[in-house]
Amino acid sequence: MSQLTFIFAAMNAGKSTLLLQAAHNYVERGMAVELYTAALDTRAGLGVIRSRLGIERGASTFNADTVFDHRILERDTACLLIDESQFLRPVQVRQLHRLAHTSQVPIRCYGLRSDFLGHPFAGSAALLTLADEFEEVRAVCGCGKKATMNARLDATGARVSAGEQTLIGGNERYIAMCPRCFYLDSAGEQDAQSTAA
């Protein structure tokens, strides 16, 4: 039975690497795989999924207007892999859930669970609601513990606690942290207090 799977982690855990490895495994066995990534993430170029290890592969892009229905699938598609799935709209997650169950094509979405303030992305919240299976990828905090939170850094490397939810960046902009380090940091304390108020 095909299903919708959400593979999530904090920043820099290797989600894109895992997606690219999964794509390679299908292709190596002579199967067709379709890849999608968010159009707003152009760090590696438009329609390119690149891991921090340097491997990359071209992909179709999605934006807020993309409709995920049977028309996006090639006749022989064995699997649909979506990177940066936190940027999906909830209606798109519903479409993907429906597509997985009506097309018999497994759909695997890779993305962040929460933003730099610990708030859910709309796409991630919908995936946590509708996905049939979940896989958490382990990221490591600077203290060595499991990182589940993301902190945003400014140009000087200082942590910030305000700003737009979406600001595309990699290692220069974000750091994965365990919850303890996230909340002990002064910016995290300010956010926790403002959220509680």
From Swiss-Prot:
InterPro entries: P-loop_NTPase, Thymidine_kinase. The active site is at E84. It catalyses: thymidine + ATP = dTMP + ADP + H(+). Coiled coil: none annotated. One of its GO terms (molecular function) is zinc ion binding. Pfam families: TK (PF00265). It is found in: Cytoplasm. ATP binds at A9, A10, M11, N12, A13, G14, K15, S16, D83, E84, S85, Q86. GO terms for biological process: DNA biosynthetic process; thymidine metabolic process. Its EC number is 2.7.1.21. It is an enzyme of class 2 (transferase). This is Thymidine kinase. Its main location: cytoplasm. Belongs to the thymidine kinase family. The keyword Translocase does not apply. Zn(2+) binds at C141, C143, C178, C181. The gene is tdk. One of its GO terms (cellular component) is cytosol. The keyword tRNA-binding does not apply. Homotetramer. Keywords: ATP-binding, Cytoplasm, DNA synthesis, Kinase, Metal-binding, Nucleotide-binding, Plasmid, Transferase, Zinc.
